[in-house]
Amino acid sequence: MRNLFPKAFLVTWIAVGALWAGTLHAQVAGFVQVNLVSDIPGLATITDSNLVNPWGVSHSTTSPFWSSNQGTSTATLYMVTDRTTVTKVNINGNGIVNIPKTAAGPQGPTGQVNNTNTSSFPVNGGDGNSAHFIFANLNGTISAWDTGPTAFIQVTTPGAV
């Protein structure tokens, strides 16, 4: 029995060491969460009261990230310059693009796309140029933005919701 004790002790410590090394490796290979933007004060680097129930995010190769904020019927723009540095882009003086509401039903943008085709989807109500961003809304409408403080409803499907 005496001969088994040192071997069992050694095997146990090798197993503990392997477990510890595996845990250390998992921590090194893991990730760190950094909350960049939130509507909850103190939760992230930037507190933005417009970022309520965000659904969709898009961007172009030259634009900041656009967030569709269903809870405020807006889109906000954020520039991310490295892993953890974010700034809100001051578009239209207040940092938002308004997404139009309808008279009834649920409101707010849910999804969006960036339109890179400069000869397609001209904005009715805008300056006549192609839409830069197109939004799908809970109210069944499709809105488009080319410039200015507000997107414009382009298509309405009654009873879509």
Task: Name the predicted role of every residue range.
Residues 26-161:
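Sequence/structural signature of beta-propeller domains
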Residues 9-20:
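Bacterial N-terminal signal peptides
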